[in-house]
Structures are given as C-alpha cells and as structure tokens.
Amino acid sequence: MFYIATFIIRFICELNKNNKNQVNCLVVDDTMIERCRGKKVELLSRQYNHVIGKTVKVFTNLALGWTDSINYVPLLSHLIASNKEKNLIQKSNTSNIDNRTTGAKRRLLACKKKPEVLISMCRKAMKAIPASYILMDSWFFSDFSCKKA
C-alpha cells in the first residue's frame, strides 16, 4: 500500500507543480477500534475512552496519511496494543512463530509505545514523499518525540 501511495502522491505533486500555494503535510491519527467481545483475541487491551468515560476493550489504529489540503492519501497504518502487561487481555503467543516473519514483526511493533511507532512511520514517509509539516494531536508532541525526531 505504501509504494502505491507514494506513486499517487508523486503524480499529484507533478500535476500541481505550478501551484505555489500548495502545502504538503503528513497527518497522524490514532483511533480506538472497540471490540466488545474477545477474551482470547491476541493483543486486545483495555484502555480508557475519554469520549464515553469508560474502560473498553480496544485496538488502537495509528494511521499516517498525506494531504495537500485538497487530496488525502493514506500511507501507513499500525494496530497498537497496550505496552503495559496489566492492560493486555490476551498476550501475544510468539513461542511457535518465526521472528523473521512479517507477523512476528507486527506483533513486536504492536507492543511499542505510540510515539516510538509514530517516529518510525514518519521517518519512512519522509524518505519517500515531500512534506513540509506534520499535523497531529497535541499529546503526540512530547519530550520523547522531540528528542528522537
């Protein structure tokens, strides 16, 4: 998906190369995907949802996209579980999985903190596409993110 998205973005930038007002931005969003049932779903975790005021069973989808204020192209997406073991409902079963596989790498990435994953996503995107700004929620902008970026 990432390589197709970079092709589309380069095509859009080529069409708009004469537009001096075009601003290319990366957009970061984290969305809770609630799952009411699932005691045995791997890496499902409990998190507090501030909108409804309760703790719910969720996966968190961390998404990175590109925009030029007219078009939006999704780039990368990762499901993030809680990195605290007490919040995990079902831990990852990595005992019989080869660590070289994509699934094992995704499981390791799912247990990292969101700012760590965000930084790796932004670095990958900045190598491939033009972007002047990164738009995100204020909580992403922490001391950790500033030092690592």
For the regions a language model picked out, list residue spans one by one:
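Conserved, well-structured functional cores that handle cations and Mg-NTP chemistry
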Residues: M1-L135, W139-A149
